[in-house]
């Protein structure tokens, strides 16, 4: 659409450079009368080369819808707009939201929602069959809750590319039998192939976090592992087993189905009763969910 392209070009010519150095960021914070909120996990990404790398490797193409959460002062937002993505940004901090409106309000491919990203109805924002991706330097304090929110959406993103705390990234990409492997690993990997793409040092942020960070990619699986209608049961079973991850699965399943049914379920699945939950693969949890539903008839509404 020529008119849209013309508006975008005009916006890009008139915008101020957003690749701030640390001093410029501090000056901007002071001008807004604010400090980064550690309770909100606000660590602003400054490295222009890293921002360019994120945009090149995030999996999105020009014209695609991209969801950004916690845009802050817009360093990543500017890059996403420049790449001709249709950006929907969600900002919780009203001062930063005002800043973003002034900075990006004239861009035809930018939409701002001032809200708590963990409370947004994503099925309304991106209805079924609406394709979109999510790219963000996620506020670390909300990362696990926000990711779980997208996992529960009836229309999850085609891909996600997030800056996360290194420990969180390792949990999401963890394999069975490791300490990091847990309920969130299983729930995420049910839908996505997850990989830690790059470890990022604290120095590229202001203020620098106390731990290393990681850029993590999530690619939606082409084939569903879980039959439709069993999502609620799957989540329940995964959480129940990992809530007591050091116990044997025979005892844990027995609490759900009864001892006799648990023995039959394990026999039909071919699982030893003395296995620990963290030894089960995502596919194993799918098999368990199907069998437990056959015997127990869990509520999936």
Indicate where each model-derived feature is located.
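Short helix-coil junctions and helix-kink-helix linkers
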Residues: 254-255
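Primarily EF-hand calcium-binding motifs
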Residues: 271-272
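Alpha-helix N-cap and coil->helix boundary residues
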Residues: 260-261
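Catalytic cores of RNA-modifying enzymes
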Residues: 2-3, 7-240, 264-267, 278, ...
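Active-site-proximal catalytic alpha-helix in oxidoreductases
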Residues: 243
């Amino acid at each position: 659409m020529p008119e849209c392209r013309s508006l975008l070009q005009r916006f890009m010519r008139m915008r101020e450079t957003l690749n701030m150095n640390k001093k410029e960021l501090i000056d901007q914070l002071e001008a807004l009368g604010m400090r980064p909120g550690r309770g909100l996990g606000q660590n602003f990404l400054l490295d222009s080369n890293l921002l360019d790398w994120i945009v090149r490797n995030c999996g999105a193409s020009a014209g695609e819808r991209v969801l950004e959460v916690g845009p802050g002062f817009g360093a990543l937002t500017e890059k996403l707009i420049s790449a001709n993505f249709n950006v929907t940004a969600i900002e919780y901090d009203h001062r930063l939201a005002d800043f973003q409106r002034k900075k990006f309000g004239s861009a035809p491919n930018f939409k701002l929602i001032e809200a708590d990203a963990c409370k947004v109805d994503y099925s309304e924002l991106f209805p079924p069959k609406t394709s979109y991706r999510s790219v963000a330097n996620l506020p670390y304090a909300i990362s696990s809750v926000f990711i779980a929110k997208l996992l529960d959406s009836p229309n999850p993103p085609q891909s996600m590319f997030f800056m996360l705390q290194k420990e969180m990234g390792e949990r999401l990409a963890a394999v069975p039998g490791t300490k990091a492997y847990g309920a969130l690993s299983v729930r995420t990997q049910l839908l996505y192939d997850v990989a830690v793409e790059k470890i990022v040092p604290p120095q590229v942020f202001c203020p620098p976090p106390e731990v290393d960070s990681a850029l993590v990619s999530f690619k939606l699986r082409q084939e569903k592992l879980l039959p439709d209608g069993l999502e609620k049961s799957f989540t329940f079973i995964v959480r129940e087993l990992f809530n007591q991850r050091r116990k044997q699965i025979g005892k844990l399943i027995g609490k759900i189905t009864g001892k006799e049914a648990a023995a039959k379920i394990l026999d039909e699945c071919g699982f030893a009763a003395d296995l620990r939950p963290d030894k089960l693969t995502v596919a194993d949890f799918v098999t368990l969910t199907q069998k437990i539903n056959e015997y127990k008839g869990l509520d999936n509404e």
